[in-house]
C-alpha cells in the first residue's frame, strides 16, 4: 500500500505537482506531432502490452526539445486541495488510440479528447461521491481512490466486425471494486458487459467470494487486456492480519463474465493472512499468452508474527497462463516481508541482447534498488541470484527471514546503504540532529527489520523503484529506471488493549496492525526542519546496460 506513503513526503508532492504541469504541456505537443506525423499510438499504460515504455517517435529530440511550445491545456476540475492523504493526485498516463486521447481523473471520471485540439469528445462520470462536498466520501476507501493511473483499450480484431456500438472499448477500474466497460467512441456504458450479474456496464469483484476482513477496493492502476480478456486486480487493507486476499480476476471483454481468478494466498492460510495483491500495473505477453503480476506483501505490513509460514506467491513475479489463470512459473524476491517491499511497476517484457543472444526477458525493478531479470518463458534467472544473510528481528513473536535473494552481476540502481558521516543537513545543527537520531535507532544495513526501539528502513517503502516502472531502449539495450533515496523510521509498539484496533489511523505509517499484538509508528527519517536526513540526491535516473 505504498501508494499512500508516496503522498506523505512534501518534496514528493511538490515534484509531482510540478511534473503534472510540465507533462500536460509537453505531451500536448507530442500528441499533436504524432497525429500529424507518423500516427504512432500509445494504446496501453506502458506503451505496448509488455510495458517497454518506449516510443519510436523521433520528431522531438534533444536538439529541438527546447523549442516546444504549449499546444493546449485541459483542466478537468477534479482536484481535492487537502493535506495528505486526503488530497488528490494526478498520476495518470493517457492512452492514444482510436484517434483519441483517453485518461481518467482522481475523482474517477474518464475523458476522451481530440489529440490535436484538446477538445472534449465525451466524458464518463460514474456518479462517485465527491470528496469536496460529501463528508462521508472522505472515509479511507474513497480517500485512497482519489487518484487514477490509467485506463485500458480494446477493439474487435475480426475483419468487418469493428463497427457499431462497443466494438471498441475503454476499461476502467472504478469505485466499489468495479470494472467499467465504455464505448470508446461515445463513452456510454456497454450494456452487455456485466448484464448477466444484473449490472449492465460493469463487472465487480464484490460478486465473488473473498475471505478476510477490511477494505477491498479497485486498484488505482488500470486493468490490462489480453485477447478477449480484461484482467483486473484490486487494493486491500494490508494493515489487518486477516485481510482480503489479493485476488486477480479475468473477465470476458464482451460479456463481463468471469473466466478465471488467481488467489496468491494458499487455501490453508486464508483465515489468518491475506493481501499479496497487485496494486501496481500488470504486463502481458500476447505471443506466449502469459500474464505477469508483481505481487505485494502478505498482511500485515511490518509485523509477520501471525504468518510464520511460507507464502511463495507474495512479493513475487508471477507468470500466469492467460487462458486458465494457472501459475506457469513464479519467483519470490522478498522473503517474509517486514519492510513493505511490495513489487511495484509492471515487469518489463522485452527481448534483450545478452551474451551474444536475443533473450525474451521479464525485467523487474524493485523498491530495494535491485533489478531482477528472468527468461519470461521459463522463469530462469538471466543473472545469478544468491541468498544473503540479513539481520534478525528482536520483536517478541516475530521471526525474520534468515536470508534474502540478491541478484549478482547487475549493479543496483539506487543507494542501498546509509553511513552516519554522509547524513544530510541544511545547517551543522540540522545535520547533528540527524546523526543523533541515527545513533538512537537500529540500523544494520539493508533488511534491518522494524523494532521496538525503532529502526531505519533504507531503502524504504518509497523505494528504490516504485510504480512508475522502467523503460527499455532497444537501440542501446539500456534499461532506464528512476529511484527515490529516502529512508523511513519504523517502530512497533505493544498495544495496551484491543480497543486500539478501533482507533482511526493517524496516517499510513502510524496505525494499529489489526489482529496482532502491535501497532506501528513511523515517519520519514528527517531533521527537525523537515528535511530528509538521507544524503542527496533524493531522486535519480539510472541507465543499466543489459
Task: Describe each region flagged by the PLM.
Residues 1-16:
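N-terminal secretory signal peptides that target proteins for export/translocation
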Residues 17-30:
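Bacterial N-terminal signal peptides
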Residues 31-35:
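Sec/Tat signal peptide C-region and signal peptidase I cleavage site
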Residues 36-79, 96:
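Mature N-terminal segment immediately following signal peptide/propeptide cleavage
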Residues 42-46, 86-109, 140-178, 215-240, ...:
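Repeat-blade elements of multi-bladed beta-propeller folds
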Residues 63-79, 110-142, 155, 159-163, ...:
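Extracytoplasmic/lumenal domain signature
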Residues 307-308, 434-481, 485-490:
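Long hydrophobic segments that form regular secondary structure
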